[in-house]
Amino acid sequence: MRYLTAGESHGPQLTTIIEGLPSLLPITAEKINHDLKRRQGGHGRGRRMQIETDTVEIVAGVRHGQTLGSPVALVVANDDWKHWTKIMGAEPLAEDVNPEDIKRQISRPRPGHADLVGGMKYGHRDLRNVLERSSARETTVRVAVGSVAKALLNELGISIVAHVTEIVGIKADTSLVEGKTVDEIRAIVEADPCYCVDPVASAKMVDAIDEAKKAGDSIGGVVEVIVEGMPAGIGSYVHYDRKLDAKLAAAMLSINAFKGVEFGLGFEMARRKGSEVHDEIIWTEEEGYTRATNRLGGLEGGMSTGMPIVVRGVMKPIPTLYKPLQSVDIETKEPFKASVERSDSCAVPAASVVAEHVIAWEIATVILEQFHSDQLPQLKAQIDEHRQYTKGF
């Protein structure tokens, strides 16, 4: 299973084509739109989210609410396009038009963004050609793709949720998720302005975000994704590129501004002894093989153990600052303050939604690689058989 996305931040639309979905999978625009709305929310979003109302249009591969087995095409329109039709138009400029009047060219790259190196790589003197595609706006359609993947996982008894565990050093009490189902965690998260399970920490996060906004600065944080209902043995120890944790790490780091990833106890493992890290194996007739703890985050040897998968990612502060850092004009080579584009003071809550969906996509992809089927009922039967096998092993 694979997908491609196309579209610029201020272009007419974002488009994706998904190939490899089994037929007979229930999909509705309503469910995808719910996830798109979550991505637009969270305290700290900028003015762009006041302009856009992201909704998906399913234009191919689905009929009467079910996939056909052919490629699925999704489109999310950019409402702001009407203000950028001349600036971002695909057709060559007319001879009597002064390019400087409409292009809004950028020659002062922002530190920490793709602007300068992207311009070098693709030969763009106008750095807008870089930032329009490197913008996190592209994650809109990745959430739509992940929402489709979640629909598939839901049919297989696998559920997923993400929440914010830290913003600018303010840490949530993550023990509050213990003993709760994914649905229970989601209900708490969706009602919170920072998508956090800890209301005390969330209130402090809100204050910190507001302070950063007033200062023209930005702040980052940490998000956690929990996957419940995973069968054991998904992934492989045989080759490096089939390890499930490696694939999930790559997915997390593919999100704009994400710079680190960990599983289970994560980097805390470096400060513990082996007896305090590894999960003891137990067996019961009711559950089969399970673990006494879940310090490794549901992964051993590049494979799922059947315990909940727990993966965290760290997001750096957004590089677009309203009090910009020092940069250099690539045309004059003179020092200047970096260019300023509309941006968020903190996008960690929104990024947690993106993380949830890229992880969902990766897990769905690995499952379909391991249990390939052209139609959903056959896939469900294979998963059920696999679960019975691992339970009785």
Swiss-Prot record:
GO CC list: cytosol
Gene3D superfamilies: Chorismate synthase AroC
PROSITE patterns according to UniProt: CHORISMATE_SYNTHASE_1 (PS00787), CHORISMATE_SYNTHASE_2 (PS00788), CHORISMATE_SYNTHASE_3 (PS00789)
Enzyme kind, highest EC tier: lyase
Cofactor binding, note field: Reduced FMN (FMNH(2)).
Entry cofactors: FMNH2
Gene Ontology molecular function: any one: FMN binding
Residues annotated to bind NADP(+): 39, 45
EC number in record: 4.2.3.5
Pathway: Metabolic intermediate biosynthesis; chorismate biosynthesis; chorismate from D-erythrose 4-phosphate and phosphoenolpyruvate: step 7/7
Keywords in alphabetical order: Amino-acid biosynthesis, Aromatic amino acid biosynthesis, FAD, Flavoprotein, FMN, Lyase, NADP
Binding site for FMN: 133-135, 256-257, 301, 316-320, 342
Alphabetized SUPFAM superfamilies for the sequence: Chorismate synthase, AroC (SSF103263)
PANTHER family: CHORISMATE SYNTHASE
Family: Belongs to the chorismate synthase family.
Protein's name according to its UniProt entry: Chorismate synthase
Organism (species): Lysinibacillus sphaericus (strain C3-41)
Gene giving rise to this polypeptide: aroC
